[in-house]
């Protein structure tokens, strides 16, 4: 009995415990599901959410504007089949590769099979999204300097046609960038401008140009040359427009008042065009190409290219004051983020009129004219002096030749009748007469030269020389008379005369050319000495013959 009662008591206890547990569990489940049913969330989602860590909500990432980078190629880049163009595009492409997307690179160039293939390969190698636009070179009929503007119009017409939204910037292939520049360029909402430094390798100078600002609003444009330290204001949008030139070396400012820029006046005088502005230092919103009234489309019927887009951008840069801002905000040139490398092609140097020559005043022209006359007069006098000396030498030579010709002619005239009348008995007399004639002619030839001799020693020395000549001739005649036979006298005498005349002529030829007024006496004495020497040389073989006879 006791065992049965105990088992019943245990069963009751367990039953009560199970009932109590079930009631508590049911109440707990009901209490937990009641608020979830009120919010409409499922129990599974609420349970999963209860186990997730709490994370602060991140703000949405703003969408960046598209950068439209336009690069025009130089017309002379095709001369080397596009090799220099390929190098420049590769360098710029790797710079743009570091810019945060989205970015579209538009490259414009003339149609050329080789150059186009090189350019496309270079663009593909940079892994930058690009579009390569070409145009027929024969369609461009303007001056060579306007072809760059024509290429810019090609790119702007493409952007306008396809309505590409973004910020347009003209990037030269030889430009160097600071990557912070592209971050500020994306913030453009109208027109932006910034300072740019142009480094010239040929002139070894740096030209700085950019906008002038007033509270981040662009009010004008200036240019500054490092070589002259002169700052020139190209245009100013204030009411009293002035063109200012400032020389930093002398701290002097020269100001010239100009006419104020007026929109109506600019429309009437549209042919003059807006002031020249470096388009590489300007950026603008592309939506202005189809939203603004200035960009009314006037296409070329053959090419579909709007020829007025680039000029409209320049005009808009001047007139739209509310939409312009500077980069950086204060337009300070102390922070330059864009450099342009000016690398001109090496061409043969052609002499051109320098600005100094073109700007010579009347006083400078008179001075240069006087200097030219001073240089011409001495040269003319020197030329006249040389001509006079040559004429005197020529006259002396001519007179001397005439004297020799007369001597020879007289000798021949005497020999001709004498030879015909000579007999064996008269040969001696004719020989003596011929010798006397030779001596007489020599004396006649010496007569004008004796006039130049001094009264003292010159006359005595000349007489002694003549006496020696006569003595030598007499000695020669004596020897010849004894040794010559009747048949040989005539032949030897003729040969001797021919030799004397030939030797005199040979000596006179080089001496005539070098005769001057002061040298006449010396050359005459040398000639006489040579005659005596030749006569002595002739006597030597004749004396040998005489001894043998």
Curated annotation (Swiss-Prot):
Residues 232-252, 350-371, 413-432, 441-524 are annotated as: Disordered. Glycans are attached at residues 112, 139, 214, 229, 240, 251, 264, 269, 300, 421, 452. The keyword Cell wall biogenesis/degradation applies. Residues 350-363, 441-465, 472-496, 503-524 have a biased composition (Basic and acidic residues). InterPro entries: Glyco_trans_43, Nucleotide-diphossugar_trans. Belongs to the glycosyltransferase 43 family. PANTHER family: GALACTOSYLGALACTOSYLXYLOSYLPROTEIN 3-BETA-GLUCURONOSYLTRANSFERASE BETA-1,3-GLUCURONYLTRANSFERASE, GLUCURONOSYLTRANSFERASE OS01G0157700-RELATED. This is Probable glucuronosyltransferase Os01g0157700. It comes from Oryza sativa subsp. japonica. The lineage of its organism: Eukaryota, Viridiplantae, Streptophyta, Embryophyta, Tracheophyta.
């Amino acid at each position: 009995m006791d065992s049965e009662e105990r088992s019943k008591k245990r069963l009751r206890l367990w039953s009560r415990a199970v009932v109590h547990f079930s009631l508590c569990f049911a109440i707990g489940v009901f209490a937990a599901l009641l608020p979830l049913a009120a919010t409409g969330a499922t129990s599974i989602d609420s349970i999963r959410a209860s186990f997730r860590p709490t994370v602060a909500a991140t703000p949405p990432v703003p969408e960046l504007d598209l950068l439209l980078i336009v690069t025009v190629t130089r017309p002379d880049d095709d001369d080397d089949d596009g090799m220099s163009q390929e190098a420049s595009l590769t360098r710029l492409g790797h710079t743009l590769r570091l810019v945060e997307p989205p970015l579209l690179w538009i490259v414009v160039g003339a149609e050329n099979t080789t150059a186009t293939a090189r350019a496309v390969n270079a663009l593909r190698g940079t892994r930058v999204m690009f579009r390569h636009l070409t145009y027929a070179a024969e369609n461009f009929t303007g001056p060579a300097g306007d072809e760059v503007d024509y290429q810019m119009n090609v790119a702007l017409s493409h952007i306008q046609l396809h309505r590409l939204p973004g910020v347009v910037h003209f990037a030269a292939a030889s430009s160097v960038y600071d990557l912070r520049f592209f971050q500020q360029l994306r913030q453009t909402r109208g027109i932006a401008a910034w300072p740019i430094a142009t480094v010239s390798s040929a002139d070894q100078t740096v030209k700085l140009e950019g906008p002038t600002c007033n509270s981040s609003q662009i009010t004008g444009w200036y240019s500054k040359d490092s070589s002259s330290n002169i700052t020139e204001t190209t245009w100013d949008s204030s009411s009293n427009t002035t063109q200012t030139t400032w020389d930093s070396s002398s701290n002097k400012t020269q100001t010239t008042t100009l006419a104020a820029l007026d929109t109506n006046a600019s429309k009437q005088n549209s042919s003059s065009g807006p002031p020249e502005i470096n388009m590489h230092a300007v950026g603008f919103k592309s939506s202005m190409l189809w939203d603004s009234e200035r960009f009314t489309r006037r296409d070329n019927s053959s090419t579909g290219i709007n020829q007025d887009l680039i000029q409209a951008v320049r005009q808009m840069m001047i007139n739209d004051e509310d939409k312009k801002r500077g980069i950086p905000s204060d337009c300070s040139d102390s922070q330059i983020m864009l450099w342009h490398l000016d690398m001109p092609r090496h061409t043969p140097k052609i002499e051109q009129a320098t600005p100094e020559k073109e700007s010579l005043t009347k006083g400078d022209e008179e001075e240069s004219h006087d200097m030219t006359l001073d240089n011409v007069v001495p040269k003319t006098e020197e030329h006249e002096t040389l001509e006079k000396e040559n004429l005197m030498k020529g006259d002396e030579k001519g007179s001397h030749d005439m004297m020799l010709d007369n001597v020879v002619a007289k000798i021949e005239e005497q020999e001709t009748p004498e030879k015909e009348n000579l007999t064996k008995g008269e040969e001696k007399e004719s020989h003596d007469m011929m010798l006397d004639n030779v001596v007489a002619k020599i004396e006649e030839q010496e007569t004008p030269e004796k006039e130049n001799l001094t009264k003292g020693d010159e006359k005595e020395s000349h007489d002694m020389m003549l006496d020696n000549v006569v003595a030598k001739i007499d000695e020669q005649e004596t020897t010849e008379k004894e040794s010559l036979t009747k048949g040989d006298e005539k032949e030897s005498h003729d040969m001797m005369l021919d030799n004397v005349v030939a030797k005199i002529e040979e000596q006179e030829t080089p001496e005539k050319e070098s005769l001057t007024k002061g040298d006449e006496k010396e050359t005459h004495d040398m000639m006489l000495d040579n005659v005596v020497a030749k006569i002595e040389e002739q006597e030597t073989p004749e004396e040998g013959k005489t001894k043998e006879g």
